[in-house]
A protein has these predicted regions:
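Active-site metal-binding motif and surrounding structural segment of the metallo-beta-lactamase
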Residues: 50-53, 63-107
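Metallo-beta-lactamase
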Residues: 20, 24-25, 53-54, 61-63, 114-245, ...
Length: 295
């Protein structure tokens, strides 16, 4: 009996230690939600509790949005007034309708709003991770901006800044100067199981590198990437090094007359273990860059 209780206790202990804490308070009134890929909710989220309302950054999938709202309600009962979409990709925006139904206004760059209206329907119809979008709807940004939009109540300040084209045409970031925090969307990921998506039709690789250089020059202590663990300026630099290395090797291969599949076999990105460890993702990225550069 004692042995059975010991084993049961050990199992519970191991299980609890293996569970990841999804929400962390990063500063007074600032909270981070870890996007759990194992539950098909892979996009990270940050929210800021202002004096009278909440601003959230990225909407996840509908089921992820529902959980995020539940977590926000554990921190405050103030209304969720704004949700910022860093870019149009489905894992960051398909939860928009859940937030709108809770009273929020969706915010993005003008380019992201335009991309969202013309792209993404196929992914919506297919669902994600075996889950259907039935019962939900696509919801587009109703508040857009050209270059910058600032929320400031004297306690918190969040600057929404257009950085695209880079990962997508309309990339935007959220910068919290007082807390020295940066929310990057997928301009930067950290430990994402599939590396990074470089296949977007409007991706601008050289501009993406310059954007990462610019962001790394800001006064930042904490980077909240689009996917994966919290990082620092070093995370931005690692992301840049991976993209630059892959881009250089593909360009060199094209100049040497090598085919796309030859480059998939030959290009070595193992020096970037956070990004280059997934062979399927790496192959997809190499093919995407090859096709774009050959246009």
């Amino acid at each position: 009996m004692k042995a059975t209780l010991f084993i049961l206790g050990l199992f519970i202990s191991v299980t609890m230690s293996a569970q990841k804490t999804l929400v962390k308070q990063l500063a007074p009134g600032v909270y981070y939600y870890f996007g759990d890929e194992s539950r098909k909710m892979s996009a990270n989220c940050l929210w800021v509790v202002f004096k009278d309302y909440v601003l959230a950054i990225d909407a996840n999938y509908p089921w992820g949005a529902q959980e995020i709202i539940e977590e926000i309600r554990k921190t405050t009962m103030k209304p969720i007034r704004y949700v910022f979409n860093t870019h149009y990709h489905h894992d960051h925006t398909f939860g928009n309708s859940v937030f709108v139904d809770s009273g929020a206004t969706i915010v993005s760059t003008k380019e992201t709003a335009a991309e969202m209206k013309t792209l993404g329907q196929k992914e919506w119809d297919q669902g994600w991770g075996g889950r259907s979008m039935e019962g939900y709807r696509r919801e587009f940004p109703s508040l857009t901006f050209d270059q910058r939009l600032v929320f400031d109540d004297g306690v918190h300040r969040v600057e929404l800044i257009k950085m695209g084209p880079a990962h997508t045409l309309g990339d935007g970031v959220a910068y919290l100067p007082k807390e020295k925090m940066l929310v990057t969307g997928d301009l930067c990921v950290n430990g994402n199981p599939w590396g990074n998506n470089v296949a977007d039709r409007n991706a601008d690789y050289d501009k993406w590198l310059r954007v990462l250089d610019t962001l790394a020059s800001w006064n930042i202590k904490t980077v909240v990437p689009g996917h994966g663990e919290l990082g620092t300026i070093e995370t931005l630099k690692h992301q840049r090094a991976y993209l630059a290395d892959m881009l250089t090797q593909v360009r060199s291969g094209i100049k040497s007359g090598k085919s796309k599949e030859e480059l998939v076999k030959e290009i070595d990105l193992r020096r970037h273990p956070v990004y280059g460890k997934n062979k399927v993702s790496t192959a997809r990225s190499i093919r995407a860059i090859y096709d774009r550069l050959k246009l």
